[in-house]
């Protein structure tokens, strides 16, 4: 994410997220292992950890194995151009950003680390989420979270909610 997305001027025209800077300076970034990275600032960054834990968290990772098919540095140009045309995007960067939106749940093929995975198209009036079998948290008894296997959100006009509730 850091090298291929956050610091790519085509994908992030204003650069990395503001919360990654301390007094205007970006951190040093190191890959420690296949599973670990390190961000190191010259001075403390009091905003970084709260940003990771916020309701709309700072996503400092991406599923490279999936996203590389939409990135000009990794995908074959002919394949990438076909995808750009098929999805009616103006260029590869617009396609990459469309397929990479972790906040909208509009790409049901995007691998996520969240507790549930959206399995319905966002254009529908029902959003269906299934438990992510790869979610990384467990409870104190060792059972994988979340407990709920599936939930469905019905999207309706606020004038219809009373009627829908009344009819079950």
Could you tell me what each predicted segment is?
Residues 1-11, 38, 48, 162-166:
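Aromatic- and charge-enriched surface segment that lines or borders ligand/interaction sites
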Residues 3-4, 101, 114, 127, ...:
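Solvent-exposed, polar/charged alpha-helical surfaces in well-ordered, non-transmembrane soluble domains
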Residues 17-96:
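Surface-exposed binding/hinge segments that line
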Residues 22-26, 32-36, 111-113, 124, ...:
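Extracytoplasmic
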Residues 33-35, 41-45, 131-133, 157, ...:
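A mature extracytoplasmic/lumenal domain signature
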Residues 107-138, 158-162:
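Bilobed "Venus flytrap"/periplasmic-binding protein-like clamshell domains
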Residues 132-168:
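Ligand-site clamp/hinge motif
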């Amino acid at each position: 994410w850091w090298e291929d997305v956050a610091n790519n001027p085509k994908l992030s025209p204003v650069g990395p997220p503001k919360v990654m800077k301390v007094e205007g300076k970006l951190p040093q970034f190191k890959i420690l292992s296949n599973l670990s990275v390190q961000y190191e600032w010259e001075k403390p960054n009091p905003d970084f950890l709260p940003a990771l834990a916020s309701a709309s968290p700072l996503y400092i990772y991406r599923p490279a194995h999936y996203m590389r098919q939409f990135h000009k540095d990794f995908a074959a140009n002919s394949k990438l151009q076909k995808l750009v045309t098929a999805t009616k995007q103006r260029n590869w960067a617009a396609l990459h950003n469309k397929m990479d939106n972790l906040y909208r749940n509009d790409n049901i093929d995007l691998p996520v680390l969240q507790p549930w995975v959206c399995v319905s198209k966002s254009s529908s009036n029902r959003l269906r989420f299934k438990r992510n079998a790869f979610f990384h948290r467990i409870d104190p008894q060792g059972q994988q979270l979340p407990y709920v296997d599936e939930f469905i959100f019905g999207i309706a006009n606020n004038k219809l909610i009373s009627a829908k509730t009344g009819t079950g």
